[in-house]
Amino acid sequence: MNNQASRLDNLMNIKNPKSFFDNKGNTKFIAITSGKGGVGKSNISANLAYSLYKKGYKVGVFDADIGLANLDVIFGVKTHKNILHALKGEAKLQEIICEIEPGLCLIPGDSGEEILKYISGAEALDQFVDEEGVLSSLDYIVVDTGAGIGATTQAFLNASDCVVIVTTPDPSAITDAYACIKINSKNKDELFLIANMVAQPKEGRATYERLFKVAKNNIASLELHYLGAIENSSLLKRYVRERKILRKIAPNDLFSQSIDQIAGLLVSKLETGALEIPKEGLKSFFKRLLKYLG
C-alpha cells in the first residue's frame, strides 16, 4: 500500500508543460456515452484518456459504467479495491486509485449496483469527497458511463462538463444515439458525436449528418458537434484480447491517429473557452451527481 501511495504522490507532482494555469479545482469532466452497448464506448474512453495523457495533460479515467465496469480489464491492470470501497469507508480514495502511467490514473468502478445506495448517502459521499485533494491536480477526468438513457447514466452525464456520444453506422445504433441526443439536450446546449467502426471516413460524416438533420428539425437550440470518425482496425480486436491499449502499442495505426485528432478537437473546445466551464473539482462533480440522482 505504501508503494501505491508513493507512486500516486509522484503522479500528482508531475509538472505539466502544456498547462499555463494552476488547475487546482479546475478539472474538466468529459463523459463518454452511447445510445446502446457494443459500439466501442469503453475502448474509446480508455484510448482517449491515453491520448490526452500523451499530449501532456494529467488525466484520470472514472469507470462509471454501473453494473458493467470493466476499464481495469481494458487497461490490463489488477485492482483490489474500487470506488465502492471508498464510498463505504473501507478504503481511502488514495488507496483505490490505480496508476496506469505517470500522469494517467484509473478510478475503478464496481460491477454491481450497490454503489448507487452509497452515492445517494450524503454522509458517505461527504466523507468521500473530502479526500478530493488527491485528484485536484488532474486536468481532465474521462467518465466512462453506461449505455442507454437510464436515470443513473443520465445523472453522470448531467454532472459532467462535456458529453460525447459514440455511435456506429448501424441503423439501430443511430436510432438509439438520437434518443441519447434528445434526452441530453434537455440539460446540455452542446453535445459531441463520434462515429465509430466505420468502413471509411465519409461513412462517419454521413452518419453525423443524418443525426444532425433529425436533431436540428426537432431540437432547434441544440449544437451537435462532429468530432470525427474511427475506422475499423485489424489490430483493435487483437489488443483488446491482450488487454492492451491500442493507442499505446500502435500510435501510427489509423485508430490511434483518429483518437489523437478527436482528443485535439476536444482540447481546443475545452481550453479556448468555447465551452463555458466553471472552476471545479471532484467534490463539485459528485455534489451535482447527488442532485441529479436525488
UniProtKB/Swiss-Prot annotation:
UniProt KW ATP-binding keyword: yes
Superkingdom of origin: Bacteria
Record keywords, A-Z: ATP-binding, Bacterial flagellum biogenesis, Nucleotide-binding
GO (cellular component) term, any one: cytoplasmic side of plasma membrane
Chain residues that bind ATP: 35-42
Gene3D superfamilies xrefs: P-loop containing nucleotide triphosphate hydrolases
General function of this protein: Involved in the placement and assembly of flagella.
Protein name according to UniProt: Flagellum site-determining protein YlxH
Lineage: Bacteria, Pseudomonadati, Campylobacterota, Epsilonproteobacteria, Campylobacterales
